[in-house]
Amino acid sequence: MLRIAQTLEAQLRAAMQQAFPEADGELNPALGPASKPEFGDFQANGALALAKPLKQAPRQIAAAIVEQLQNNPEFSALAEAPQIAGPGFINITLKPSVLAAEVRQRIGDPRLGVAAVEQAEAPVIVDFSSPNIAKEMHVGHLRSTIIGDCLARVLEFRGHQVLRLNHVGDWGTQFGMLITHLKQVAPEALNTADAIDLGDLVAFYREAKKRFDDDEAFQTTSREEVVKLQGGDATSLKAWGLLCDQSRREFQKIYDRLDIRLNERGESFYNPQLAAVVDDLRSSGLLVTDEGAGCVFLEGVVGKEGKPLPLIVQKSDGGFNYATTDLAAIRYRLGSAGDGAGRVIYVTDAGQAAHFAGVFQVAKRAGWVPAAASLEHVPFGLVQGDDGKKLKTRAGDTVRLKDLLDEAVERAQADLRRRLEEEERQESESFIDQVATTVGLAAVKYADLSTNRITNYQFSFERMLALTGNTAPYLLYAVVRISGIARKGGALDGELPERLVFEEPQEWALIRQLLQLDAVISEVESDLLPNRLCTYLFELSQSFNRFYDQVPVLKADEPMRSSRLALCRLAADTLKLGLSLLGIPSLERM
């Protein structure tokens, strides 16, 4: 109901100006959704802020505003007579005919009343997932991948040009030590594709890391190998390319399972730009040499001794680091010679907040961030086990993402087979596989997205696969229930009656919930909190279930029957759209 809210806000502001022409400054109606259904649809609190400057009681001010509103025929066409409550709140209830007209407009509209941005603005970049080459994706990559994908989907649906970037860790010292180790223990891996699988590569990486930590001669050889790689040595580059390809194929298997679309642009892409970053910082007077390292001292960030903390961009040996690469990425992403983006969103764990705050500050001070552009860090908490600690295997290892997804599907299949047996239902193996895969992966995604991303959350297969509560299976089942109406003879896509007729409180509660979709999507677009969309879909499912359990649909007389079927259709379409923005496909049967 964003359009109606904007209209009401303009009408309220005009009424305030007419009632109090002597008021200074811009008048703010302070319009928002009503805090409780009994207070109507909207509540305006602007009278309270005017009490002090006008030296009048808030209720007296509210009464004057209401009088002007009621003199406006356009307002009277939208809403019932406003009510003044409490110290001076103005409660506004929309007319039933207005709500019914809004429902009619949304039925059959693929956007369900959600407006697209008016004109194509500068691209929006969402940087997410970002695993490291030669390492398997683990549970720590789950949140970045799922949250980033959801945000990209919402922004794309709103009409933004979105560039989904996978900033993979494909460069650095680790390749020097890995290539050096493989030359000695598995040379075939450096010149033959698929000579080893990723699991073996990970094991070799661990061995190489141990040797690097323990053996000084190995360290020296590894660093020499890095120099060769950076210098464009053909043999080293071929080995590096094979290692990257091997990891890339394994990553893609995970992305395909989760229906994630990404454009890979790894750290190596920015290598040719690193020296220019340091030169720019030096020429702008920001770069300071401290103990041999090139750094920029941060403003407003001090250490234990009260001294400004540095952001190191060039090590004392002349090498570069993550900060240099991230600065080069910002410079390219926002620059007219690069992506020309207007908004860059980084989806990483909360532990990197200080790093990004420093990098963003330096980029702004260097003049690489245009006035209209924004850099946003989207932090998230840890995935924990039932013990409240970081999720680990029983052996204490990090949980591989592949294993976690496999177990989710296996558990969903076991639950489904048990339910089929209890209900004495016969279904094909292909049906069981499809439903179990959809439910299992949806449960993992939804459990993550439904939690406020800023907080940690405890991973529990039992909770996330439950058919009750704020879970993916509960939402999917609501869609299945509506699909069942069509199977029972209720044409959900039938012609609408000439006039939609709604009488029951359960109908109006569902309608008001359905009409909030555009406002919720707008909130997610600005606040980047997917749990807001999850909460909305859960409350919508609850509202639909109350309506369907308490109000006859198929057995109702006309025009109530057609009107209620239209509500069912809009509820199904809204749930399906909302789930798709979370990256979750719907099911017709479960």
Swiss-Prot record:
Localization annotation: Cytoplasm
Record field: catalytic activity: tRNA(Arg) + L-arginine + ATP = L-arginyl-tRNA(Arg) + AMP + diphosphate
Domain of life: Bacteria
InterPro entries xref list: aa-tRNA-synth_I_CS (IPR001412), Arg-tRNA-ligase (IPR001278), Arg-tRNA-synth_N (IPR005148), Arg-tRNA-synth_N_sf (IPR036695), ArgRS_core (IPR035684), DALR_anticod-bd (IPR008909), Rossmann-like_a/b/a_fold (IPR014729), tRNAsynth_Ia_anticodon-bd (IPR009080)
CC annotations in GO: cytoplasm
Keywords: Aminoacyl-tRNA synthetase, ATP-binding, Cytoplasm, Ligase, Nucleotide-binding, Protein biosynthesis
GO molecular function, one term: arginine-tRNA ligase activity
Protein EC: 6.1.1.19
Primary location class: cytoplasm
SUPFAM superfamilies reported in the protein's UniProt record: Anticodon-binding domain of a subclass of class I aminoacyl-tRNA synthetases, Arginyl-tRNA synthetase (ArgRS), N-terminal 'additional' domain, Nucleotidylyl transferase
Biological process according to GO: arginyl-tRNA aminoacylation
Motif ('HIGH' region): 131-141
Enzyme class: ligase
NCBIfam families documented for this protein: argS
Family matches, as HAMAP family: Arg_tRNA_synth
PANTHER family: ARGININE--TRNA LIGASE, CYTOPLASMIC, ARGINYL-TRNA SYNTHETASE
Family note: Belongs to the class-I aminoacyl-tRNA synthetase family.
Subunit structure: Monomer.
Protein name: Arginine--tRNA ligase
Protein's organism: Synechococcus sp. (strain RCC307)
Top-level taxonomy: Bacteria, Bacillati, Cyanobacteriota, Cyanophyceae, Synechococcales
